[in-house]
């Protein structure tokens, strides 16, 4: 549960997470991003991209939007997903699931098994990375995407 603290934290009613994050958005974002990488550092990020992320996250409206995404996942999205499951709705297009082998998702329920409950034709592979596959291991991420798209 400690690894996924961000879900219940960010889903709290406003303005709690917005206020706490807004007190030092650069510290919060750097901490979260570093802790979600396999190396627990920001080394995988191009400095220009990191500057862009930090600039965007200093905007209170973007912080709020991030929190709203988690609130939706905890409440409205959950209800929609539940209704889809009860109706027997499934994703029928071929689907590729990628996840970081050292990421939080890998420590919870197996990601491929989770997606197989929702899709009829899903394949997947763990990328040797944390949460940020494209930044941490671009070669393996691109190879997995190209393989899937060429089939």
Name each model-derived stretch.
Residues 1-126, 146, 151:
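Flexible "cap/lid" subdomain of the alpha/beta-hydrolase fold that forms the substrate-access gate
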Residues 130-142:
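Catalytic histidine-centered segment of alpha/beta-hydrolase-like enzymes
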